[in-house]
Amino acid sequence: MTATASALRMRGISKIFPGVKALSNVNFTVEYGRIHAVVGENGAGKSTLMKILSGSYAPTTGTTEIAGVEVQMRRPADAQKLGIRMVHQELNLVPDLTVAENIYLGRMPHRRFLVDRQAMLRKAAAVLKELEAAIDPKARLGDLPISQQQLVEIAKSYSADPRIIVLDEPTSSLSEHETTALFSILRKMKSQGIAIIYISHRLKEVLDIADDVTILRDGSMIDTRPAAGITAAEMIRLMVGREVANVFPKTPSKIGPVAFKVTGLSDGEKFHDVGFDVRSGEILGLTGLVGAGRTEVAQAIFGLAPLATGRIEINGKAVTIGSPAAAVKAGVAYVPEDRKGDGIVPSMSVRENISLPVLRRLSRLGRIGMSRDRGLAAKYTRDFSIVPPDPERRINLLSGGNQQKAIISRWLAAGPKVLILDEPTRGVDVGAKAEIHRIIGELVAGGMAVVMISSELPEVMGVCDRVVVMRDGRASSPIARGDLTEERIMALATGEEPA
């Protein structure tokens, strides 16, 4: 290592899969003590480049240098030995283990051939304290909200004394306050000389936190610039190869009578006395800080969690929903926040994932009619522009945006009256986000009632007809589209303005 050596220098990196050139002659350099953002649409090559850096893929051509020394990484363990750590968007943790056990999994301290649990707890507590994360190291990981699990994942990487740390969409599950806290952690790491690679679709955050920005498009490196010398609009133009006039277009729709109404919903713990209604042809936004109870309300409406009190009405008639099957029968569909854990079945094809809720309808005498099954999948693959347009492809091989379109297709196949979408554009690029907004717009134009949970305020304000803000398990009165401002939403979410 020389005094002026870069933390990372990848030269001429190409990666060819059968029939696909995922990366083409990419040059990528990252310096110690700097935060380097990588942006691009899904399919631009970000994941492939990071998988090469982390040792999961070998490049077809090209070289990688760490601290001025050329290295070859044939497996993730090789990258880890070189001080490279990855924090994935889809968390790589064990829910049934404690926070401390997750942080030190695979490298727990031992004493006389046994795990030294007290030493492990002390070390975990010290790491969490250094990162200013108020998390009990003895807590079961699965009992924590996703936002705190994300911080545990970061603590796990930080505890390994990394030289280079890669964060993939690290704020996708965090509130604005938690994002600010994370940025404080990243700046502390930066001050310690750690090289940080920051992958995100949230361009405002990229400009807030990054020192440098690299834009990828179609497997090629388009540009690298200081973050201070580029705007979000320029990044979008370079990412997609065109000007994007309106990231959140509002599709006109005819708003009809109340199609869905909830009154006095409470689970006795995480949300209390929640009420709102949605009209046919309307998008009702449900926003607030992470932990405000939005997802818990949606899960209870869909029958995934019990209600202590409350009334649910569809088209003016009270319905009882005690399970997801009962919800689907009543005409309610729910697209969950956690695509990987609760949405897709990774081992199944796109066709099989789309058909799951309607297998009985597609079957005759207990046997599935394959022509009807294939026809249904082909229709949604075509209508929703799922890429690649192959219903037999395993769904886990698709980008996040295309997986999300397949999940939405699944529930539309069930013919719902009400569609609840929980963070539908979380972790997808601008192009996929626009496609998902187009789909939602077409649904409400056709008369469907949509409840959209989102933490992204520009999205809420751009797409929704009315917005309900949740704080500490309670819901505000709905705010009409014309009265929406980011300041008002945040004031309600933080308690600065009474609900």
From Swiss-Prot:
InterPro entries, A to Z: AAA+_ATPase, ABC_carbohydrate_import_ATPase, ABC_transporter-like_ATP-bd, ABC_transporter-like_CS, P-loop_NTPase
Q: How does it sit in the membrane?
A: Peripheral membrane protein
What is the main EC category here? translocase
Q: Record's CDD domains?
A: ABC_Carb_Monos_I (cd03216), ABC_Carb_Monos_II (cd03215)
ABC transporter domain sequence ranges: 8-243, 253-497
Instruction: Give binding positions for ATP.
Output: G40, E41, N42, G43, A44, G45, K46, S47
Q: Which PROSITE patterns match?
A: ABC_TRANSPORTER_1, ABC_TRANSPORTER_2, MGLA, RBSA
Pfam families listed in its UniProt record = ABC_tran
- Molecular function in Gene Ontology: ABC-type D-ribose transporter activity; ATP binding; ATP hydrolysis activity
Superkingdom to which the source organism belongs: Bacteria
Q: Where in the cell is it found?
A: Cell inner membrane
Q: What EC number(s) does this enzyme carry? A: 7.5.2.11, 7.5.2.7
Gene Ontology terms, cellular component aspect?
plasma membrane
Q: Could you tell me what reaction this enzyme catalyses?
A: D-ribose(out) + ATP + H2O = D-ribose(in) + ADP + phosphate + H(+); D-galactose(out) + ATP + H2O = D-galactose(in) + ADP + phosphate + H(+)
Primary localization class, coarse: membrane
Record keywords, A-Z: ATP-binding, Cell inner membrane, Cell membrane, Membrane, Nucleotide-binding, Repeat, Sugar transport, Translocase, Transport
Q: Which PANTHER family match?
A: CARBOHYDRATE TRANSPORT ATP-BINDING PROTEIN MG119-RELATED, D-ALLOSE IMPORT ATP-BINDING PROTEIN ALSA-RELATED
Q: Say what the protein does.
A: Part of an ABC transporter complex involved in carbohydrate import. Could be involved in ribose, galactose and/or methyl galactoside import. Responsible for energy coupling to the transport system.
The entry sums up its family as follows: Belongs to the ABC transporter superfamily. Carbohydrate importer 2 (CUT2) (TC 3.A.1.2) family.
Question: What is the recorded name of this protein?
Answer: Putative ribose/galactose/methyl galactoside import ATP-binding protein 3
**Organism of this sequence:** Agrobacterium fabrum (strain C58 / ATCC 33970)
